[in-house]
Amino acid sequence: DEKRLSRLIANLDILTGVPANILDVTGRDIRLFSGHPPFCRAVNACPEGHQRCVACDAWKVGSYRGDGGFQYYRCHLGICEALMPLYSKDQPLAWLVFGCYLDESPLEEQWARTRTRLDWWPGDVEELHRAFLQFRQYTGEELRAYAETLESLAAYIRLEGMIQSAEQSDLQRLERYLDQHYMEKLSLAPLSRQLH
């Protein structure tokens, strides 16, 4: 239910100021959130920057090694982000991400790390530096509290069935068949053909 998901993501940003988003199973942004910080908007406005961000999203999904909770990392430019799968049974259907923040280490150190990764940037690095300084910094305690809140939200998303697999289970196919044929005389042969 894209509309409800979009509203939840927007509400999180309003309440916390921390951008959250949903990526599809391959790590592609499904465009539920458009309020990225100025630094990220500037990088994404550059074709090479956008390509690097897309590749980074795919990388973080492919390298997830968590236990179902959030895995924290720094993106290709050193900005802090976190990722967790939204499961159906044992398979991720989508990914819940939050990020575009800085940790509590000194800003100068974080900028120095980012600056070393900008040799490809075609524009004025000082403009990016000014945008970088607009990132909010969060303590570990704040991030844990936010992650716990998002984990509860992830459980709600699963419970409400807001994200569905395109592939239907046997039970879902059976329910659909019964819904469509409830007025007919049922027998096992046609039912079995429909399920397999």
Language model features: what each stretch is:
Residues 1-16, 94-167:
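Juxtadomain coupling helices with adjacent low-complexity linkers
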Residues 2-79:
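Structured interaction and signal-relay segments at domain junctions
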Residues 29, 89-93, 186, 195-196:
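Solvent-exposed, well-ordered amphipathic alpha-helical segments
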Residues 56, 61-113, 135, 142-145:
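Sensory/regulatory domains in signal-transduction proteins
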Residues 164-186, 190-196:
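A short, Lys/Arg-enriched amphipathic alpha-helix from helix-turn-helix/homeodomain DNA-binding modules
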